[in-house]
Amino acid sequence: MADRLLDRAWPGDVVVEDLSYNPIAVMQRLEDEPPERRFTRAVVVAAVERGNRPPGAVTAYRWDGVLPNDEEIQRAVAEAVTGVIALDNTLVVTRHFGGLPDEVVIIEVEPGVQEFGDDFSEPVAKVIDQVCDLVVTMATDAGAVARLPSAGLGGALPIATGNRFG
């Protein structure tokens, strides 16, 4: 996904990066930005199996930033230390330790098959270009971001299924 996004033209204040690694390292990466270049918005894209959406469904929302209880935060940190790489875990850890900007846009795609590799499942392949367009819009258009629903982890209802946005 990051490779496809890197092929696009971006304004100078947008950074495209693959952050699919340890949540503690992601937090440290975000904190590495000098104060004058700290991010004001993060747009995070991930394939996440929620089980309540058809494969290829796209969900976009502004994360409300609400963290789970202390026990769940501790579990997320422990999982991060042991190498768990998952969207919710990364968001909880990076928010808890103050690495995320206030404005976080989440774009989730329900995978057809969730496994490591360079190829997308057929349902995801059908929507990947539209997902890339959505990422560009969310990274560059504050008005479009403002129109997204605000939601907790797991987000709102899908905005697209199959090969078209609804």
Q: What residues fall within each predicted segment?
A:
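Glycine-rich phosphate/diphosphate-binding loops and the adjacent beta-loop-alpha structural elements
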Residues: 115
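Short "lid" loop at the C-terminus of a central beta-strand within the Rossmann-like core
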Residues: 112
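N-terminal catalytic or cofactor-binding beta/alpha core of small enzyme domains
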Residues: 1-99, 106-109, 118-129, 138-166
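Hydrophobic "lid"/C-terminal helical patch
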Residues: 135
